[in-house]
Design a protein with these regions (language model features):
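Catalytic metal-binding/acid-base residues of hydrolase active sites
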Residues: 9-11, 40-41, 70-73, 119-120, ...
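Beta-strand-turn-beta hairpins that frame and shape the catalytic cleft
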Residues: 1-3, 104-115, 160, 211-215
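Short, charged N-terminal beta->alpha structural module
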Residues: 1-18, 120-131
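Conserved beta-sheet core of the metallophosphoesterase superfamily
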Residues: 63-67, 89-95, 166-224
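Structural motif
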Residues: 4, 33-37, 160-164, 200
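Active-site-proximal loop/helix segment associated with metal-binding centers of metalloenzymes
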Residues: 88, 95, 109-177
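Core catalytic region of metal-dependent phosphoesterases/phosphodiesterases
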Residues: 5, 11-108, 176, 183-187, ...
Length: 224
């Protein structure tokens, strides 16, 4: 089985994965998956606190998967080598914790899932490069091209889509405050052409079912 949730921000919002709040995990095993839709935050500085929470996740009755958001330390993340899993590329961060690389269609628990991490930080002017902000938060042209190639190979049909930010038209329904950028425009193109059952995303610190096709997640943990 697969569950998805929103940003964990290291240990700040990880409490939603406790057995008290996420009771379904008692019936799960390491063959089941919990996927975080970006801003995982537990590959940041290698501190003792970070290692504690990685160990805590490893001890859960599920395997943790995550896509990157805009608040990740990409310098450290990209030091982890890519390895083959789910028919694509992942980074093994710790036992039973895997980062899902951008722009892939993966087969997880028999479901075809398109994953595309990344988002634009709208408070960049208050952040410091390589300390609290990384240029790699936004996918490169190469990563977007890889995503298109992956979708081409799958005839533009998947079961689910997991991203950190939303397509432009969906984002605009959440708030007028959010600006257009190359990634939300790219995702808008994908939205128009892709056949999918449902699209889940994080980033906006909100739990809301937008419509029959889109759900934004933050604290909720839901099964797909």
């Amino acid at each position: 089985m697969i569950y998805v949730t929103g940003d964990t921000h290291a240990n700040w919002d990880i409490g939603k994965l406790s057995s008290r709040r996420f009771k379904e995990q008692k019936e799960m095993s390491k063959d089941d998956y919990l996927i975080v839709c970006g801003d995982f935050g537990l590959v940041w500085d290698g501190s003792a606190r970070e290692m504690y929470w990685q160990d805590w996740l490893t001890s859960r009755n599920f395997t943790t998967l995550w896509i990157d958001g805009n608040h990740e330390n990409f310098d450290i993340l990209y030091e982890f080598p890519l390895t083959d899993k789910f028919g694509g590329k992942v980074r093994e961060i710790a036992p039973d914790i895997y980062h899902l690389d951008r722009g892939q269609v993966l087969t997880i628990d028999g479901k075809k899932i398109f994953v595309m991490g990344g988002a634009k930080s709208h408070d960049r002017e208050y952040r410091i490069e390589h300390i609290s902000w990384w240029e790699q938060e936004m996918p490169s042209n190469q990563e977007m091209e890889r995503a298109i190639e992956a979708l081409d190979k799958n005839q533009w049909e998947v079961d689910y889509v997991l991203t950190h930010c939303a397509p432009r038209s969906v984002q605009s329904t959440l708030s007028d405050w959010y600006e257009n950028d190359p990634l939300v425009s790219f995702l808008e193109r994908v939205r128009k052409d892709l056949k999918f059952k449902h699209w889940y995303f994080g980033h906006y610190h909100l739990d809301k079912k937008i419509n029959d096709k889109f759900t934004v997640l933050y604290n909720k943990v839901i099964q797909i």
